[in-house]
Amino acid sequence: MVLGISLALAACNQPDKKGDETKTTGSTGTAKKEVAQQATIDAAKAAPNLYKVVSDTMGIRIVEVTYKPGDSSAWHSHPDYAIYAAEGGTATFYGKDGLKMENEMKTGTIMVRHGEFHSVKNTGKTTLKVILVEVNRPMGTMAWDAANDAVKVAGNLYKVAADTLGIRVLQINYKPGQSSALHSHPDNALYVIEGSKGEFTDKAGKKTVVELKKGMMMIGPAETHSVKNIGTTTMKAILVEISRPMK
């Protein structure tokens, strides 16, 4: 893919219970003992009204998350993931240990987090919209052309925002006319913040022009290419690179 295509880049309703198992009430802590025994509870299945799967392939999943003020979810889980706050807000996270934490996420916040199990409520006054990139891959290394790392080759265009757990988040910024030398990315997920038109040239010299629209999201395999912004507007994106082997 291009933009890695290269510019190629939390929740949820309780699952059904049987018999007299503990019920979840307005206070998520009441189900603490039951929740501790739950296995994986996919947020997108538990709360499809809050979690929308945009793309799911190669052990990488992009999920668009939207919580309006007052929206809440029951217990659910996430594997290791990266998060980008497209529209900031305030949310309270409830852990299975009974602890709760209020988190004010400003627009543009970027994090990489371990897999976790929680419930969430929007306790702010604005809609919270985040992009989640979940990684369903084991820890380890994968083969890619690290010698031509985009950050080393074009550090003025690719900035590291977070790098841990084999997940690296890059902030990408190409002004009109700017271009990069040939560089590489491992498998990745892309979220376009501000769109433009990009020209991608692969190792063989083949050129591909892509209209990168605001809000575009995609997952792409490792690749090597150069990029040029041939549009008239600045191109900004978040690229989540995954340096882990597939299962």
Write out the residue ranges for each language-model feature.
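Histidine-centered metal-chelating micro-motifs
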Residues: 70-73, 110-121, 179-180, 216-228
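Surface-exposed beta-loop interaction hotspot
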Residues: 129-165
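A short glycine-rich, His/Asp/Glu-containing loop-to-beta-strand
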Residues: 48-72, 80-83, 151-179, 187-190, ...
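Short acidic-glycine-tyrosine-enriched beta hairpin
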Residues: 55-56, 97-115, 206-222
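Bacterial signal peptide processing site
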Residues: 13-15
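C-terminal motif of bacterial Sec signal peptides marking the signal peptidase cleavage site
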Residues: 8-11
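Glycine- and acidic-residue-biased ligand/ion/polar-headgroup-sensing regions
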Residues: 78-97, 185-204
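Ligand-binding loop in jelly-roll beta-barrel domains
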Residues: 88, 116-137, 195, 222-246
